[in-house]
Amino acid sequence: MTTNTVRLHRVLRAPPARVCRAFLDADAIAKWLPPDGFTCKVHQLDAKIGGNYRMSFTNFSTGSGQGFGGTYRELVPGERIRYDDHFDDPRLPGEMTTTITFRTVSCGTELQIVQEGLPDVIPVEQCCLGWQESLVLLAKLVEPEIPD
């Protein structure tokens, strides 16, 4: 699928296991996934193949929210996560597929994200910007080495 697809690449100064865990832990997701100006609530997260998740983003300025959820289709810890998801709003139809790959590199983890099947009403560039904001927050979560 080449249209309605977002592709992202980032190198993080953290091991793949830690970066991967940030995609599978409800508290971590709520901290880093919402782009600027949004909050996130994770309602359900069963991180296993065939497991489901449900969450919502809320626009902090207006209070309006958007729910979405999906199913984990592939899960190889520290290497690859693939899930499908869909919005609750009928004006945002269809199913998206997101594939995240983690690869060990000399300074940490190379992260690649491909999100396919965006609804036509969501500009790919806007979605890409949102992901970029989220990935800045992800780096702030996973890169610090804080002793106990």
Predicted regions and their residues:
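Intrinsic-disorder/low-complexity, polar/charged segments enriched in Ser/Thr/Lys/Arg/Asp/Glu/Gln
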Residues: T3-H9, P16, C40, N52, ...
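Glycine-rich portal/gate segments that line the openings of hydrophobic small-molecule binding cavities
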Residues: K41-D84
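Hydrophobic ligand-binding cavity/cleft-lining segments
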Residues: M1-T39
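Hydrophobic pocket/interface hotspot
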Residues: V19, I29, Y53, Y72, ...
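Short, highly charged C-terminal tails/helix-capping segments
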Residues: L141-D148
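Generic structural detector for well-ordered beta-strands
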Residues: R7-R13, Q44-D46, S56, T71, ...
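Structural motif
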Residues: R13, L75-P77, V105-C107
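Beta-strand/loop substructures that line and gate deep hydrophobic ligand-binding cavities in soluble
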Residues: R82-E133
